[in-house]
């Protein structure tokens, strides 16, 4: 059986994304519009208030007030009041099946066009990421319950070695399994849902014909590819074939092409841009109907590709994990989040072109960029060090980590890392969403002055520490420290006293949180009073506060396991 061989690049990325799509998540209140109202029966049947994962990697606004969230453990939405998790189906869904529930899995991609929405799902088999398919709806604002069409992860048949596209046929290695075939990005434009599925390559789904097709792109050594002409080889049964072309997403050392590993995609009008493990591809879709003689018409339906890569075209790095289109003053800028691939001299950062790919520039070098969001002159870059904003693409300012400044809120995003951002312009004053590994936050303006934060609450009334076990070297990394958070529930006085004891009940740390002044999470960075990290072991936290208006402050105890 011909299948795609797992490569080192696939392995390393799958490990990263597995960590990305696992975690804990999310609940809260917001002041966004209230025009959308979920019916109670829908809440009870298909939605559960709060979320199951703090990891939020996708944010899409839709209609007057809906905001859809792609989390590490499923699909979620904010309806203008509260956050809900979409319930999942434990049963295996069939290709083309209508369903009110969605598949289990993390959400690597959400695409929206009007009321049409597509959501991709993924998981793992213990060794590698696996594509769980896509759900598609044409009425994403249906308050009586959305009807989804489930599309299984597209794969090829073993015999699919010669496929039609454009003005002829091309040869390919069939991708027959969902392993490493994960839809990491998707976009809706015109008649098509475009998907970038790594080993599954670039594919598009015709929304009317309800059919998938593979979309061939240039091989690694090609700077262009025409699917409109050049099909000069003829098979024994008369098919016109592209000579010397082979679609193969294996590694180059195994006969394949990094440029056939699609990871990011945007489409608009007659143009599609695709980021791969070997740069950026620009496709111009040609559709012409010409009358070649009276009553005889010739239809031309194809794509002309241009391929840009490091070092020849000036990209920062060839592994392009995110793409965005900016339209400002009549000029289109294409932004590409670039990582190292396999060529010496590559760097992380942003690559961009303002002249349709003719020339490329770089900025934010050495930053690990996940996603880019644009609006008019504004560019937002979501990175491992935080959210950056620019008005010109050259000068950048970084937001401080999100903190809820409301009195007694004591909520905070305890991570530098921002996976994604989204501008919400549906009210008079635009708002800003960010998705992180520690929840999702909504700013009341684009400046980040005041945040509402939504995070998982496992038990709203219990006192507990999380994550637990806790590693100060890897968990909740913020400004050089790692943190464990203490959940207290409602606090009815203005002081919280935190004491940390080792297993011998010797006090190693103490802090008083004056809630009249302090804003942020009740937390500990795993350090003792001297500033040094404590040793591995079991620790006990004593937290003193008043849990109701009619009670004096009292001590609450919880246990923490520190493992560096």
Regions found by a protein language model. Name each.
Residues 496-508, 539:
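Short, glycine-anchored, charge-dense loop/turn motifs used at functional sites
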Residues 74-76, 130-136, 201-203, 279-282, ...:
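A short loop-to-beta-strand structural motif that recurs across blades of beta-propeller domains
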Residues 44-48, 87-101, 146-177, 215-255, ...:
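Surface-exposed loop and turn segments in beta-propeller and other repeat-based domains
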Residues 540-564:
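C-terminal tail/sorting-segment detector
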Residues 66-69, 117-119, 192-195, 271-274, ...:
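Conserved beta-propeller blade signature
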Residues 416-462, 471:
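Blade-level signature of beta-propeller repeat domains, shared across WD40, Kelch, NHL, RCC1
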Residues 459-499, 524, 549-551:
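Glycine-centered coil/turn sites that cap beta-strands in beta-rich domains
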Residues 44-76:
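Beta-strand-rich domains and repeat architectures in extracellular enzymes and scaffolds
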């Amino acid at each position: 059986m011909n299948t795609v061989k797992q490569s080192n690049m696939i392995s390393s990325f799958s490990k990263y994304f597995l960590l990305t799509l696992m975690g804990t998540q999310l609940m809260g209140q917001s002041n966004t519009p209230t025009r959308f109202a979920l019916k109670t029966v829908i809440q009870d049947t298909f939605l559960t208030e709060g979320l199951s994962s703090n990891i939020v990697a996708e944010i899409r606004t839709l209609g007057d007030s809906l905001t859809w969230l792609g989390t590490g453990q499923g699909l979620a939405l904010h309806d203008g009041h509260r956050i809900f998790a979409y319930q999942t189906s434990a049963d295996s869904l069939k290709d083309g099946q209508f369903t009110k529930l969605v598949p289990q899995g993390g959400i690597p991609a959400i695409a929206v066009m009007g009321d049409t929405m597509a959501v991709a799902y993924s998981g793992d088999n213990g060794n590698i990421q696996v594509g769980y398919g896509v759900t598609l709806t044409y009425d994403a604002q249906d308050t009586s319950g959305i009807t989804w069409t489930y599309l299984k992860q597209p794969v090829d048949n073993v015999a699919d070695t010669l496929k039609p596209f454009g003005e002829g046929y091309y040869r390919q290695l069939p991708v027959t399994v969902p392993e490493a075939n994960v839809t990491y990005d998707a976009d809706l434009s015109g008649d098509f849902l475009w998907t970038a599925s790594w080993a599954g390559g670039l594919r598009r789904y015709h929304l009317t014909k309800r059919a998938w097709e593979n979309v061939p792109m240039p091989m690694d050594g090609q700077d262009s590819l025409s699917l409109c002409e050049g099909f000069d080889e003829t098979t024994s049964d008369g098919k016109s074939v592209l000579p010397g072309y082979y679609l193969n997403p294996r590694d180059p050392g195994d006969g394949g092409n990094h440029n056939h590993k699609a990871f990011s995609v945007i489409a608009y009008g007659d143009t599609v841009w695709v980021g791969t493990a070997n740069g950026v591809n620009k496709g111009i879709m040609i559709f012409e109907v010409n009358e070649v003689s009276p009553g005889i018409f010739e239809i031309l339906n194809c794509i002309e590709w241009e391929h840009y890569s490091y070092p020849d075209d000036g990209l920062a790095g060839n592994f392009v994990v995110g793409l965005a289109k900016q339209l400002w003053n009549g000029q289109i800028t294409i932004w590409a989040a670039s990582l190292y691939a396999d060529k010496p001299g590559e760097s992380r950062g942003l690559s961009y072109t303002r002249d349709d790919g003719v020339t490329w520039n770089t900025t934010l070098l050495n930053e690990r960029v996940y996603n880019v969001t644009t609006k008019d002159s504004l560019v937002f870059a979501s990175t491992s060090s935080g959210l950056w904003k620019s008005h010109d693409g050259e000068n950048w300012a970084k937001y401080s980590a999100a903190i809820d400044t409301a009195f007694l809120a004591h909520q905070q995003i305890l991570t530098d890392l921002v996976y994604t951002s989204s501008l919400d312009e549906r009210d008079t004053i635009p708002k800003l969403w960010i998705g992180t590994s520690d929840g999702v936050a909504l700013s009341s303006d684009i400046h980040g002055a005041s945040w509402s934060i939504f995070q998982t609450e496992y038990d709203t009334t219990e006192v507990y520490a999380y994550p637990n076990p806790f590693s100060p070297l890897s968990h909740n990394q913020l400004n050089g420290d790692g943190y464990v958070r203490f959940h207290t529930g409602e606090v009815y006085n203005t002081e919280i006293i935190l004491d940390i004891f080792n297993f011998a009940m010797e006090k190693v740390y103490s802090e008083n949180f004056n809630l009249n002044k302090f804003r942020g999470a009740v937390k500990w960075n795993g350090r003792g009073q001297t500033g040094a990290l404590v040793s591995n072991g079991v620790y006990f936290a004593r937290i003193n506060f008043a849990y109701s208006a009619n009670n004096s402050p009292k001590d609450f105890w919880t246990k923490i396991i520190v493992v560096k």
